[in-house]
């Protein structure tokens, strides 16, 4: 299955096309995974750093998806190789059961619980080769396999996307939202070498972006993406709502500067009413205008998106919903806010001007003890 965005035709082509309106452009390929043949989700900038296919083989393990699109995950383990799978997802196991050891592992419960990421996993190891079947409880899911060789890191955008993994050097760490950034709340960063199995709702598609290309995606549809220099930024399309300018007479400012309103704003009743108001505003932004919240990705990168979207409250926190809603429509927030520094010549000129510009103050003392200061240049 192959789709082209944008383009008037649906011919599978990767050539540059000329448009009288948009100029030179290249079609972005979206392909479904897994399929009967190997589909690389990397581009020329990553040099085959990782692949997502219907099977992935490492020196000590082999992952293979059985059936499509709603399927089982078959895992073949060599001796002394560890398999981590989400608790309650193991369907069956073949081999010598007396050599198999299963241990319940609690992975960073405090950090993962705070972010809503599952932290109960089952560690399976054996002294002899075994084969295991892994599945999920949801009837509308599909799998995507990622084989990492240590050159490209991945960010898992969905909290429940990670199903199983293997690899001694593979590291999976949850990421906190330190600066209210939408791209690092409830996510998991995957680094190292190994094989991981991701699960998504519906069918999973891969989108490859090259240098200079952009793509807008809904956060509830994004399963994972490769780490890049510029993280995805919140984006809102321009709204067609007609706003009527109302002159500001300053009545509200003068009203809130009164002693009555100042004392009222410090009361518990006022704080309770404001909490209810902000909760209702966040609910309306998430429920009614939730489809206006998007993420903008900059190439080169690779995205994995799912056809069935999760709920917005499963992806974004309350403060993130408000952050995107307050973003100016049609623009994105810069990844790094550069601090404007004046040139050295301008700084020296300003310093010299301040030194040459002297002021003199005259103090007048009255009989009643009152002192008046008058500044002269």
UniProtKB/Swiss-Prot annotation:
One Gene Ontology cellular component: mitochondrial inner membrane
Name by which UniProt lists this protein: Altered inheritance of mitochondria protein 24, mitochondrial
Organelle transit peptide: 1-35
Region of interest (Disordered), residue spans: 340-362
Compositionally biased tracts (Basic and acidic residues): 346-358
Cellular localisation: Mitochondrion
Gene name as annotated: AIM24
GO BP term (any one): inner mitochondrial membrane organization
Pfam family, one: AIM24
Keyword Zinc recorded: no
Keyword Transit peptide: yes
Keyword list, A-Z: Mitochondrion, Transit peptide
């Amino acid at each position: 299955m192959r789709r082209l965005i944008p383009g008037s035709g649906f011919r599978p082509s990767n050539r540059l096309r000329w448009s009288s309106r948009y100029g030179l452009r290249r079609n972005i390929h979206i392909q479904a995974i897994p399929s009967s043949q190997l589909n690389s989700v990397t581009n020329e900038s990553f040099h085959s750093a990782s692949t997502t296919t219907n099977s992935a083989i490492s020196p000590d393990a082999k992952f293979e998806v059985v059936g499509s699109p709603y399927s089982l995950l078959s895992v073949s383990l060599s001796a002394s190789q560890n398999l981590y799978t989400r608790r309650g997802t193991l369907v069956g196991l073949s081999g010598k059961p007396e050599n198999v050891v299963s241990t319940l592992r609690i992975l960073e419960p405090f950090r993962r619980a705070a972010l809503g990421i599952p932290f109960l996993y089952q560690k399976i190891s054996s002294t002899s080769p075994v084969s295991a079947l892994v599945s999920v409880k949801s009837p509308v899911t599909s799998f995507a396999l990622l084989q990492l060789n240590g050159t490209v890191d991945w960010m898992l955008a969905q909290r429940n996307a990670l199903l199983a993994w293997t690899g001694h050097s593979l590291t999976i760490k949850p990421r906190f939202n330190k600066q209210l950034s939408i791209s690092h709340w409830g996510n998991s960063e995957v680094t190292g070498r190994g094989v991981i199995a991701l699960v998504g709702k519906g069918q999973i598609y891969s989108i490859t972006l090259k240098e200079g290309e952009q793509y807008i995606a809904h956060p509830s549809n994004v399963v994972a993406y490769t780490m890049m220099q510029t993280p995805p930024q919140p984006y809102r399309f321009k709204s067609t709502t007609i706003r009527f300018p109302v002159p500001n007479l300053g009545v509200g400012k003068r009203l809130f500067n009164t002693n009555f309103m100042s004392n009222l704003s410090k009361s518990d009743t006022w704080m309770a009413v404001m909490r209810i108001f902000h909760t209702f505003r966040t609910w309306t932004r998430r429920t009614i205008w939730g489809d206006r919240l998007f993420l903008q990705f900059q190439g080169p990168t690779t995205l994995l998106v799912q056809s069935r979207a999760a709920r917005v409250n499963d992806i974004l926190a309350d403060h993130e919903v408000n952050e995107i809603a307050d973003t100016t429509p049609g623009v994105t927030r810069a990844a790094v806010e550069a601090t404007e520094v004046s040139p050295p010549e301008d700084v020296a000129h300003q310093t010299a001007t301040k030194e040459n510009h002297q002021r003199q103050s005259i103090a007048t003392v009255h009989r009643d003890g009152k002192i008046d200061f008058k500044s002269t240049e």
